[in-house]
Amino acid sequence: MNYADKKILVLGMGKTGISMVKWLSRAGARVSVADTRTTPPNLELLSQIVPLETIFCGPFKAELFKDIDAIAISPGVAIAEPLVQAALQQGVSVIGDIELFAIALDQHAPPGTKILAITGSNGKTTVATMVGEMARNTGWDVEVAGNIGLAALDALMQRIDTGKWPHLWVLELSSFQLETTSSLRPNAAVVLNLSEDHLDRYRIIEEYAAAKARIFPDPHNSCVQVLNREDARVYAMAHENSKQLTFGLSAPAFDDEFGVLPSGSDLWLAQGTTRLMKVSELAVAGLHNAANALAALALCRAIDLPFEPLLHALHIFKGLPHRMQKIAEFNGVTFYDDSKSTNVGSAVAALNGFRKNVILIAGGDGKGQDFSPLEQPVSKHTRGVVLLGRDAEKISQAIQGCNVPVHRVATMDEAVRVSFLLAERGDSVLLSPACASLDMFNNYIHRAEVFTTAVQGIEHKFILTAQTCH
């Protein structure tokens, strides 16, 4: 599409919005920008790209949407916004950053450039990072972008300006980005899993699933579908005329299946009946990370990358901050930071990765989720649960039949202190909130920092007490 002299309204001034402003401005569009926040981030940066008189802060007004050719919408702005819906009904196109990226890639990328696309409720960032490391280990130049690291358009502009094109683009994509994407043609794409999330944006989980399914182009495209065969909603996304590879923690029977094979006392990552590497050789903990590794392997094999460097990369992959990250161990108790667990599915996966008794710290803003899936793993894996935040009571009600002690606290410091008192030698204290953080913290990273500081405080007191006793 030729954007020269087109009047385009960009909604949202976050990282993605700024990337769209930069891309559209260099394409010659007449750009205006709006954000519902009165003092949005990046305002000073934005004023260096477009004239101040084209920047509007505060509630959206109807006049902003008049006489425009298109709306470029940030993931944080809902398409259900009434003024956006009114514009759609008048024939105004609504696009997002990934749609702009896909169109541009068709125009600029050299032949043979590969694309792997990743979405899901949980594990997206881990799998995208894994795939990037695995593909780099084969000698390829790889760009990992999208809902991770650089915005896709920022990464694209850097590559255009340097003239150095990657062999492979690895794109982590959110459901919000996929809502406005129709031109992306990945060589292979995966939906890792689906659990209740973002139900503050979607009326029902089926709407959320439909947005995720947009990662797969029409059935006549050559995209390989990588599907979680143990998630019914994901498996139902299979196109009759497309090639599929599946992954899961069950034993694989055929060459198009990746899974876990038991052998004696060991568990192996496998393709079909071929054992690839022991699960215990992964540097990341938990069976959910074994599933992540299998999804990453399936994606890489879909574009014929060789096994040996892929497996070596998996062997040394250390994981990501705030995702089942071990932060301390003292008095026989291990503390794990899984603050990135912002939905129920993620917390369930974290708990199911433990064999030892766990003291679970959970709670926050549940975003309308159903917490009942926590009941079984809480019953099976926890010695106690410590709850805080806005939806602590809802979680407490959901797990009341578990016959596990539940403690309500007001602060993270108190949560850590109570957890340490509940824990016995050999136990783990796990922060896996199953909720968003904004009711009490700036973001999930801030929540993790407060947790880590509290753990360090307890550890310091424990060491001082031990020294005094000696």
UniProtKB/Swiss-Prot annotation:
Annotated EC: 6.3.2.9
Gene Ontology molecular-function annotations: ATP binding; UDP-N-acetylmuramoylalanine-D-glutamate ligase activity
Pathway: Cell wall biogenesis; peptidoglycan biosynthesis
DNA repair in keyword set: no
Subcellular localization: Cytoplasm
Biological-process GO terms, alphabetical: cell division; cell wall organization; peptidoglycan biosynthetic process; regulation of cell shape
Catalysed reactions listed for this entry: UDP-N-acetyl-alpha-D-muramoyl-L-alanine + D-glutamate + ATP = UDP-N-acetyl-alpha-D-muramoyl-L-alanyl-D-glutamate + ADP + phosphate + H(+)
Amino-acid positions noted as binding ATP in the UniProt annotation, renumbered to this chain: 120-126
Alphabetical list of Pfam families matching this protein: Mur_ligase_C, Mur_ligase_M, MurD-like_N
Primary localization: cytoplasm
Gene3D superfamilies attached to this UniProt entry: Mur ligase, C-terminal domain (3.90.190.20), Mur-like, catalytic domain (3.40.1190.10), NAD(P)-binding Rossmann-like Domain (3.40.50.720)
GO cellular component, one term: cytoplasm
SUPFAM superfamilies cross-referenced by the UniProt entry: MurCD N-terminal domain (SSF51984), MurD-like peptide ligases, catalytic domain (SSF53623), MurD-like peptide ligases, peptide-binding domain (SSF53244)
Record keywords, A-Z: ATP-binding, Cell cycle, Cell division, Cell shape, Cell wall biogenesis/degradation, Cytoplasm, Ligase, Nucleotide-binding, Peptidoglycan synthesis
Chain's role: Cell wall formation. Catalyzes the addition of glutamate to the nucleotide precursor UDP-N-acetylmuramoyl-L-alanine (UMA).
Family: Belongs to the MurCDEF family.
Listed name of the protein: UDP-N-acetylmuramoylalanine--D-glutamate ligase
Species assigned in the record: Nitrosomonas eutropha (strain DSM 101675 / C91 / Nm57)
Gene that encodes the chain: murD
